């Protein structure tokens, strides 16, 4: 193919390489030997060779000169059917593309289902040059939805190769964002497969459906995980993008104005703001399969804290079905920590409670500590070990560490107070055992009473047996 000399076979989608390697498109080299075998070089053949070389080296002035001669047309096809415009697009030479289009080149030309727009989107070059080429072709009515033989559209190639602005321009020009190729891949799937986080965010913003599966039943998130792009896996699996589809309702001009910017700082700010928008409410609802309730709750300014304290009548008020309520209530039951009424401790401090009540208090306190330990263990398990895998925007780590230090101090104070309580109880127990005037426990009194009852019963039985013997003796006499 025409691009073979620069980057190997320029197979964008439908254009497979040929069996022959002699296509005459070597950069900086013309096959003069083959011409000599023909006996002599004809002027027209010489001009064609010069034209090929000019396209290869990007010599715009020579291309214009040869086109002006009238011997060569912009729609002439070289070996394997490529036109000059297709070759210029394959090397992302925007200036050559402009010259050829101004000369009347057909922007909608295709060869074996490979369009010029597909060739431009899969070109090797800077994104700036590729973007200019694509913009020129779209301005000449190139169709952004024509697919190659593998059913891949231009947006899939742009997403695969990491060209964020090209993806956005194609969508603004009418490209279908959720089209699937022969393997069921969408543009989002290709971006997830290649690890292009910025394109994943942009596609979600443009309305990409992250739940579309491939032919083998894989979601984009699973494709990302399989290729070890764990940050994208987390982004697609555990969060819901609040900007999803936000740009779909804008006009083409408004969309281009919003998405085509070369300011890297603005682009980075957008990426981080998109990440920061993911919150604990979305994560909680996604874990329960209730993503559809996110927008409704956000519209009513309901936070996760509010959700966790809602009553059943409030769930009904906000449109939760009985099945949704059961899911949330079951989750709340697992998270529930039995509350201790610490306001009653003043009574306990005066020892105006029974032993059973005091024991119940200690059991509740122990249970609550167990819940807290489990909660911390779960957090440790869920936190990523690599900072690159953190999707949500976090505050300064110093804030977290300072709170953890306070927690450690509080736990140490609690441990000290519990030890003091234990020592006090042990001291009271020892003093009671050594006090000769202490009242026996209820269990001890009941044991003593049972012994008296047993002895009385034996005495009565013995006396009755004696009367029975005397009666029999008296009757015999």
Swiss-Prot record:
The keyword Cytoplasm applies. Pfam families: Ank, Ank_2, SAM_2. Its main location: cytoplasm. Residues 1-23 are annotated as: Disordered. The modification Phosphoserine is found at residues 17-18, 20. GO terms for cellular component: pi-body. GO terms for biological process: cell differentiation; male meiotic nuclear division; regulatory ncRNA-mediated gene silencing; spermatogenesis; transposable element silencing. Keywords: ANK repeat, Cytoplasm, Developmental protein, Differentiation, Meiosis, Phosphoprotein, Repeat, RNA-mediated gene silencing, Spermatogenesis. The keyword Phosphoprotein applies. It is found in: Cytoplasm. Interacts with DDX4, PIWIL1, RANBP9 and TDRD1. This is Ankyrin repeat, SAM and basic leucine zipper domain-containing protein 1. It comes from Aotus nancymaae. The gene is ASZ1.
